[in-house]
């Protein structure tokens, strides 16, 4: 009898061959009918418009909203959107590099370096700063003391799950608005020409200020500081609300 391992291998070949055959025949037929390759049509009709939409404020805010919604539910939002997000970020960076190589000005602001500096870092760092400024809750301040170190490197899990921000309806609105405000400020700065578009791949975990400096020069540092300050201001009223909630809970227990 044929060994099971060999049988399994050949069984796996059947769907592979059928898939390749179907795509090949379909692509050939499309080429004969339309005069262009299927992959080219997909790029010009679907991918390129989506790339343009992703570089717009609406596209940026929609994907941030989806990401933050998953985080609110306790699901790692960045990992969920990563398969959809990263190809567009990589394409934008490649377009910027190609523009520089051709002696042109890069025009795609939203790259992975942009995401690291102006979307990832505003998640938990402004929360820590707002807590240190106005929060009277000992539990919040204890979490902030632990989370501030990782937050400087864009690691938000200690704050997200420690405070927690998960299922925290009081902090839901600022957790979305703060990121949108910081990233929107950066996008505006790029649009008006103050902050150059990123042409360097900035790795996740690059600390605050350095991430902006590597990706966007000194202008990026200025924009990041402004964005983080605005994001912190967004959190302050909600921290005051959290103070009152804690006082009410303590009064009810007494």
Description of each model-found segment:
Residues 31-49, 76-89, 192-200:
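Interfacial/capping segments of alpha-helical transmembrane domains
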Residues 98-113, 120-152:
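Membrane-embedded helical hairpins/re-entrant loop segments and their flanking transmembrane helices
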Residues 94-103, 146-149, 160-254:
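Transmembrane alpha-helical segments and their short flanking loops
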Residues 1-58:
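Membrane-interface helix-loop-helix junctions at boundaries between adjacent transmembrane segments
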Residues 16-29, 63-71, 123-132, 178-184, ...:
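Hydrophobic core segments of alpha-helical transmembrane domains in multi-pass membrane transport
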